[in-house]
Regions:
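Conserved acidic
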Residues: 1-208, 266-277, 282-289, 298-770
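Basic, amphipathic alpha-helical patches used to engage nucleic acids or provide basic targeting signals
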Residues: 232-292
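Active-site metal-binding core of divalent-cation-utilizing nuclease and nuclease-like domains
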Residues: 200-236
Length: 770
């Protein structure tokens, strides 16, 4: 449906939109769902992210998708009956090398078969539908049996389905807080000078006041929202802006009316409302302290201590901490662009952390509840050695760290650098900048910041801290952990459905296997359930890997409205909380309007807690860094949960089972997610190449153009040239959801800008100097 199937359904409905009245959820032009009253169209790929051809193997049924000569499907051939069409009609160039070979083997056995177009096209389409239906029914049945949740009825993606399962079956009370829209501080609009006065009162009188500068404005039980409130003394603090409260001294003509507002904005009305509000607060028994804006400004002129205090507030009255600023992705880059083993004892090894994110979800600590907010000067009393939570601060990196610790978003990428200015300028030379130019401001998870400090980062200023209580799994007692119940449930299912390991052939070996697994994971396997079940294993793996990302989803996602009435379009344009992005005509009666809301105005979803998402990715980066730190300059490449490195006898290596790349001989990379290597296959006794390039499908045709040799030639020669791959018949949808076929070309070139290049194909972080 995301591809183009949904386009046919939608355009048919839009031809008679008054009858169908479809509502759509989309991601750009990709259709996620179409709903018409009680009928809902959803995408199986949103739940089962695999090709239809692997459904039979995954869900263990006998049908096979088979092959069809798509290019033979022309009007001239609709009544064709004869020999099987030639290979050129089967789009063999668009297949992987393995798929292509399977097709060649099959085609060679069909010499005597008769191909009747009118029957074969129906048979192929029916088999597609049959496989899809059987796979989806089995998936839904397994999901409901295991989770008591109907994925297709109660969610639109596997991620939302996982979140629903967690909240229904595993979420403990009072553990995950819903972060208020706009955060905890300065979300209530209050003038900067009002915050300064409230902070001065806190400082000079040593009282704790709740106000918008560090949390939300307090609403007293009588329903009145006040500027500040001290619980201990039952005191309300009100800052009276002269303009908004009708100050008689500053506005002696009390009949003045703001021409942009209504008659009720006359100064005397504002003054009377202020007096009445003050009387009401006192009547309710509150101590009331008021400060007029003009009085406070006069006080600042004569009170030097107050002026110094306001000056020293500094950046705490700037933008509040945004937890999304601490939500960085995985760490991906090449630290050396080419390496060939010396042919004697050196090897290139590929280490992959098995199930990194499920491991993090189970064993690592997570924030619970709502944080205590510390701002500005308050942060000086907080120890960075022990505080848990998110920290907004200015840091100065060391100048000689080969693998920097802290991330920084720059140039649309996640960078790890030692000088902010070198990063901005992409300076390929040695850094000559001052400390002020090298330092940068960021928001970090406390654990990642502590790791940075241990690697000689200096914290120059701390602007704000969200201090959380933590929940963590105890390996000794096998108790606790925010997500351990969820992870254990599906880890158990996955392990049981994998069957017995090959070395478990006797009852004693099976018993020891169960005991060892319990000792390691705290999960007691049921020997009666240990049998191969590829469908359930696939489901368990999906539930483990698709779980955590929902916590970091953006709240303000683009929305699409189907508009057939001019008044509805005008309403969208005049709504101050709507930002229209695009308008695409569908026909004479209907347009599609894509829109979103201003920053901070999105819906506060109950499935989202960005602090949890930030902790998840920070823990994953720290796990990867534990290997980078020890491997040092032997690292060639890393990507979120894997690392490729050089090893000689006696060198430190991560503890693990068999290495995927124990016999890698030669490695080359042209940038992040852009690498290739030659590996010796012991099973085939031959040298094989693996090549990965983000954004380009390396099918049979494209792999003739982009492969180990061409990538190596470009890197070794530092080529500025480009390679191009072509697809003569790319099926796409346009902005009006028409499905068309058109030629497509993609450009490939060396793109390396996350570190600076030096001799011998090595690299250094921007800002590095000995």
């Amino acid at each position: 449906m995301k591809g183009y199937d949904g386009c046919f359904v939608l355009r048919c409905m839009l031809a008679n939109s008054a009858r169908w009245r479809p509502k759509i959820i989309s991601n750009g032009l990709k259709l996620i769902s179409i709903q018409c009253d009680d009928i809902r169209f959803i995408d199986s790929l949103s739940f089962i992210p695999s090709s239809l051809s692997v459904f039979p193997k995954t869900f263990n049924f006998p049908e096979s998708k088979g092959y069809f000569p798509f290019l033979f499907n022309t009007s001239e051939n609709q009544n064709y009956e004869g020999h099987l069409p030639a290979l050129e009609y089967f789009c063999t160039d668009q297949m992987s090398t393995k798929e292509r070979q399977n097709l060649l083997d099959w085609h060679a056995t069909q010499n005597n078969s008769v191909f009747k177009m009118s029957e074969e096209i129906v048979k192929y389409c029916l088999m597609d539908v049959k496989i899809l239906v059987k796979g989806c029914i089995q998936f839904r049945s397994m999901f409901m049996d295991q989770n008591k949740v109907d994925p297709f009825e109660e969610s639109t993606t596997i991620a939302s389905g996982c979140n629903k399962v967690f909240r229904r079956l595993f979420l403990k009370e009072n553990t995950i807080g819903l972060i208020p829209k706009g955060g905890y501080r300065r979300a209530d609009k209050q003038s900067k000078v009002a915050i300064q006065w409230l902070r001065w009162v806190e400082h000079s009188q040593q009282v704790a006041i709740q106000h918008a500068g560090k949390a939300r404005e307090f609403r007293i039980p009588e329903g009145i929202k006040v500027d500040g409130y001290c619980v201990e003394t039952n005191t309300v603090y009100e800052f009276l802006g002269c303009y908004w409260h009708g100050c008689e001294e500053c506005f002696p003509n009390q009949a003045n009316v703001d021409p942009k507002l209504d008659i009720n904005t006359a100064m005397f009305v504002r003054n009377e409302n202020t007096v009445a509000r003050s009387q009401r607060l006192r009547k309710h028994g509150y101590n009331l302290v008021e400060m007029r804006e003009c009085d406070f400004k006069r006080l600042m002129l004569v009170n030097e201590e107050l002026r110094d205090f306001i000056h020293n507030l500094g950046d705490q009255d700037e933008e509040p901490l945004n937890p999304r600023d601490a939500f960085y992705g995985g760490r991906t880059n090449a630290s050396k662009l080419y390496h060939k083993c010396d042919g004697i004892s050196e090897k290139i090894m590929y280490y992959d952390v098995c199930s990194l994110y499920p491991y993090v979800n189970k064993y690592c600590k997570y924030p619970i509840g709502h944080p205590k907010i510390h701002v500005g000067l308050e942060c000086k009393n907080i120890s960075l050695d022990t505080v848990e939570g998110l920290i907004k601060c200015r840091v100065l990196p060391p100048s000689d760290l080969y693998h920097p610790v802290l991330p920084l978003k720059m140039h649309g990428k996640l960078m790890f650098l030692l000088c902010r200015t070198c990063g901005v300028e992409l300076n390929e030379g040695e850094c000559g900048h001052s400390e002020a130019e090298r330092s940068f401001v960021g928001t970090f998870v406390a654990d990642e910041l502590r790791k940075a400090i241990a690697n000689n980062y200096k914290v120059l200023d701390v602007f704000e801290i969200w201090e959380y209580e933590m929940e963590v799994y105890d390996k000794a007692t096998k108790q606790g952990g925010l997500f351990s119940g969820y992870i254990d449930s599906f880890l158990k299912l996955k392990q049981e459905c994998s069957g017995w390991p090959s070395h478990c052939t006797t009852d004693a070996e099976k018993k020891k296997y169960i005991e060892d697994y319990y000792e390691k994971e705290g999960i007691l396997l049921d020997e009666n359930n240990i049998k191969k079940n590829p469908g359930l294993r696939y489901l368990a793996k999906l539930m483990l890997n698709s779980f955590w990302g929902k916590f970091g989803q953006r709240e303000n996602l683009p929305q699409t409205s189907i508009v057939s009435e001019p008044k509805d379009l005008f309403k969208l344009f005049t709504d101050p909380l709507v930002q229209v992005q695009t308008i695409n005509p569908i026909n004479d009666d209907v347009v599609l309007v894509s829109w979103d809301r201003p920053e901070g105005e999105g819906e506060n979803l109950k499935t989202i807690n960005v602090s949890i998402a930030a902790y998840t990715t920070a823990h994953a980066r720290l796990e990867l860094y534990s290997y980078l730190e020890k491997l040092g300059r032997r690292v060639l490449y890393y990507d979120t949960d894997s690392v490729i490195f050089v090893a000689k006898p006696g060198d430190w290596k991560p503890t693990c089972g068999d290495f995927l790349g124990s016999y890698i001989d030669e490695f080359v990379s042209a940038g992040p997610k852009n690498y290739s290597y030659n590996v010796f296959s012991t099973s085939d006794n031959a040298l094989k190449s693996t090549c990965k390039v983000k954004g380009i499908t390396l099918n049979y045709k494209n792999s003739r153009v982009i492969n180990f040799e061409t990538m190596k030639d470009m890197v070794l020669s530092n080529s500025k040239d480009s390679l191009y791959v072509y697809n003569d018949r790319k099926i796409v949808r346009d902005k009006s959801y028409n499905v068309i076929s058109r030629p497509e070309s993609k450009q490939y070139r060396i793109s390396y800008s996350k570190r600076r290049r030096i001799e011998n194909f090595d690299t250094l972080p921007f800002g590095y100097k000995e």
